[in-house]
Amino acid sequence: MGQTYRIDRLNLITRKRRPQKVVNEARCRYLAKSQLVKCNAQNKHFDYLNFRGSHFKKVDFSFAKISGCDFWGTSFNKCNFSNAYITDCVFMGCKFIDCKFDTAHIEYTTIVNTNISGCRNIVLGKFVEVLSQYPDFQHTSDLEEVLEALKNNTNICKYKLLHLPGNKYNRLNIYLLQKKFSPEELPKLLWRISGKSNKNLTTYKRLELELKAEKRMV
């Protein structure tokens, strides 16, 4: 029997002739399958939010700061990212339709299997990685042993950071981790977090930062 988790998601929809709903700032939340329509997110800070499978329509993110967030299978329809600051995010299999990115700053971000032709006036920073195909990672027996053990970590599994449904690995996140840590380091660092709650490790970037913190303590 699969594990059940507490549902945490946003469902903000501004109806006709009603005041525009405002998106509150948030940090370290797993907000899968959220839905935001005709909302105001101007000048807001969003840190380490996981919007897997979410839908945004006519949301105004102008001048917002979006840091360390994950967007897997997320759709953006006629959203405004003008002058937004987007850093350390992951966009995987996303769909953009007629979105504005005028003077947006995008850096240290990974974009995979995502067509950005629907992003008007987008300019990608020097340290943005764009992958047309889902990557694989370097398999080792030590790594696979700790990945198997981490299947029992409730929050690591809930946030789908290392494992995906169908008993599959999250190859993208593991690929990104192997760019930051050596093949010898990564399994050891993952073991160090295996017995922890990891409640706040909601996105890839939070996981990376936690492993870096563990490395400093070794």
Set out the residue ranges of the language-model regions.
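Tandem repeat scaffolds
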Residues: M1-N152
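Terminal module of membrane-associated proteins
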Residues: V130-V218
